[in-house]
Amino acid sequence: MFLLQGAQMLQMLEKSLRKSLPMSLKVYGTVMHMNHGNPFNLKALVDKWPDFQTVVIRPQEQDMKDDLDHYTNTYHVYSEDLKNCQEFLDLPEVINWKQHLQIQSTQSSLNEVIQNLAATKSFKVKRSKNILYMASETIKELTPSLLDVKNLPVGDGKPKAIDPEMFKLSSVDPSHAAVVNRFWLFGGNERSLRFIERCIQSFPNFCLLGTEGTPVSWSLMDQTGEMRMAGTLPEYRAQGLVTHAIYQQAQCLLKRGFPVYSHVDPKNQIMQKMSQSLNHVPMPSDWNQWNCEPL
């Protein structure tokens, strides 16, 4: 195991991961944030350097004090060799399997590795598999070979106009975390609320405020640079409002040089159509999350 330290190593890692997009996207986005201030205080581990086969991004041990907090106890993994990956993840200094944790990756082949480890280390695992989307602008910049112009929507990728008297674009405030938490599919508890508050305080997030000055639609970003937790109050749905929050956030990220990507549940046809209307393109790899609990 090798801990990457210093700006030069992390920049080399980012450059190397770029060659493996979109399979490495979750890890690539996380390393980009580490190279821009590292707001979540993460660390990068590789099996060897510089010719690594497996990379794991994880929090510092001192930040993982709550054994039940899988939002904090999150690992991002990319590997070019599954046998090597299983051996690397098996190391206690790489992953603390005694905790409730989650592993995220845009690499579906890791499922076999994690299921094998679940059998040998006695933990139960729940997998969430979703459609991975990347903005066409990001694809053009990072992986132009993936961009099939024939399949792009005809539109300009901009949302329809909304009534400026009714809705005002704003940033998300920490006081808005509770409403985001209430409607987040992976949230709804105290630990997820703390995670959302941390994301709001650390990254650019956007919302639409209604006439009462409270959020009616929003889009946030997590420590991997992914746009997540987007939602709209039920009484304001079917108006295309969330499209505005996501569009503004995407423009902000593009200006900063970050990849624009997100995931959508395969059953959520509405958000799939919304993603395509913004010229976000489904990727050949999936978005994966494995929630692991020791037995």
Swiss-Prot record:
<dbReference type="GO" id="GO:0032787">
    <property type="term" value="P:monocarboxylic acid metabolic process"/>
</dbReference>
<dbReference type="InterPro" id="IPR016181">
    <property type="entry name" value="Acyl_CoA_acyltransferase"/>
</dbReference>
<dbReference type="GO" id="GO:0009636">
    <property type="term" value="P:response to toxic substance"/>
</dbReference>
<keyword id="KW-0216">Detoxification</keyword>
<comment type="similarity">
    <text>Belongs to the glycine N-acyltransferase family.</text>
</comment>
<feature type="modified residue" description="N6-succinyllysine; alternate">
    <location>
        <position position="140"/>
    </location>
</feature>
<feature type="modified residue" description="N6-acetyllysine; alternate">
    <location>
        <position position="255"/>
    </location>
</feature>
<dbReference type="Pfam" id="PF06021">
    <property type="entry name" value="Gly_acyl_tr_N"/>
</dbReference>
<feature type="modified residue" description="N6-succinyllysine">
    <location>
        <position position="168"/>
    </location>
</feature>
<feature type="modified residue" description="N6-succinyllysine; alternate">
    <location>
        <position position="126"/>
    </location>
</feature>
<keyword id="KW-0012">Acyltransferase</keyword>
<dbReference type="InterPro" id="IPR015938">
    <property type="entry name" value="Glycine_N-acyltransferase_N"/>
</dbReference>
<keyword id="KW-0808">Transferase</keyword>
<protein>
    <recommendedName>
        <fullName>Glycine N-acyltransferase</fullName>
        <ecNumber>2.3.1.13</ecNumber>
        <ecNumber>2.3.1.71</ecNumber>
    </recommendedName>
</protein>
<feature type="modified residue" description="N6-acetyllysine">
    <location>
        <position position="158"/>
    </location>
</feature>
<feature type="modified residue" description="N6-succinyllysine; alternate">
    <location>
        <position position="15"/>
    </location>
</feature>
<keyword id="KW-0007">Acetylation</keyword>
<dbReference type="Pfam" id="PF08444">
    <property type="entry name" value="Gly_acyl_tr_C"/>
</dbReference>
<dbReference type="GO" id="GO:0005739">
    <property type="term" value="C:mitochondrion"/>
</dbReference>
<feature type="modified residue" description="N6-acetyllysine; alternate">
    <location>
        <position position="140"/>
    </location>
</feature>
<feature type="modified residue" description="N6-acetyllysine; alternate">
    <location>
        <position position="15"/>
    </location>
</feature>
<dbReference type="GO" id="GO:0047961">
    <property type="term" value="F:glycine N-acyltransferase activity"/>
</dbReference>
<keyword id="KW-0496">Mitochondrion</keyword>
<dbReference type="InterPro" id="IPR010313">
    <property type="entry name" value="Glycine_N-acyltransferase"/>
</dbReference>
<dbReference type="GO" id="GO:0047962">
    <property type="term" value="F:glycine N-benzoyltransferase activity"/>
</dbReference>
<feature type="modified residue" description="N6-acetyllysine; alternate">
    <location>
        <position position="126"/>
    </location>
</feature>
<comment type="function">
    <text>Mitochondrial acyltransferase which transfers an acyl group to the N-terminus of glycine and glutamine, although much less efficiently. Can conjugate a multitude of substrates to form a variety of N-acylglycines, thereby detoxify xenobiotics, such as benzoic acid or salicylic acid, and endogenous organic acids, such as isovaleric acid.</text>
</comment>
<dbReference type="InterPro" id="IPR013652">
    <property type="entry name" value="Glycine_N-acyltransferase_C"/>
</dbReference>
<feature type="modified residue" description="N6-succinyllysine; alternate">
    <location>
        <position position="255"/>
    </location>
</feature>
<dbReference type="GO" id="GO:0006544">
    <property type="term" value="P:glycine metabolic process"/>
</dbReference>
